[in-house]
């Protein structure tokens, strides 16, 4: 069966309106795309990394609940999952501040077999930062 494989960063977005936290949701550009595909029944798989922390567990659970295969999510021991603060202006445009571990270790993860008819989506973060 044809797969859609997303490769990208995942983080927890804490969204502020009028300088007050309104909600916290998992996110990331490729993350959002692959979750949307999982929700409509696509054979969706996501390659990413999370920490072995509460935020990482929340992210992995969210992926599973939205029909995204998490077999290729790398859980990094002792690493904190990335968090972003999204401050919305009056037009709901976001100004982001990112918090992530300065991890320069290469990503060590299992890769899925990619067939000729599979689709692979690359996120902006991993497109410019392969480590």
Language-model segment annotations:
Residues 1-15:
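Acidic-glycine-rich active-site phosphate/pyrophosphate-binding loop
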Residues 1-5, 64, 70, 93-131:
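Ribokinase/PfkB-type carbohydrate-kinase core domain
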Residues 3, 17-84, 88-93, 101-106:
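Substrate-binding N-lobe of the ribokinase-like
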Residues 8, 47-48, 124:
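Small/polar loops that bind or transfer phosphate-bearing groups
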Residues 10, 29, 125:
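Active-site metal-binding loops of divalent metal-dependent hydrolases
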Residues 11-14, 37-43, 115-120:
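A short alpha-helix capping/helix-coil boundary motif
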Residues 15-16, 130:
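Short N-terminal helix/helix-N-cap motif within the alpha/beta-hydrolase-1
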């Amino acid at each position: 069966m044809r797969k859609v494989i997303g490769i990208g960063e995942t983080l927890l977005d804490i969204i502020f309106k009028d300088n007050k936290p309104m909600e916290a949701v998992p996110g990331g550009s490729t993350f959002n795309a692959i979750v949307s595909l999982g929700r409509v029944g696509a054979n969706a798989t996501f390659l990413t990394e999370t920490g072995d922390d509460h935020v990482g567990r929340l992210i992995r659970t969210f992926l599973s609940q939205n029909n995204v295969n998490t077999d290729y999510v790398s859980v990094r021991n002792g690493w904190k999952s990335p968090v972003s603060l999204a401050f919305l202006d009056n037009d709901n445009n976001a100004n982001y501040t990112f918090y992530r571990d300065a991890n320069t270790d290469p990503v060590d993860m299992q890769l899925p077999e990619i067939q000729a008819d599979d689709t692979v989506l690359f996120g902006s973060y991993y497109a410019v930062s392969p480590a």
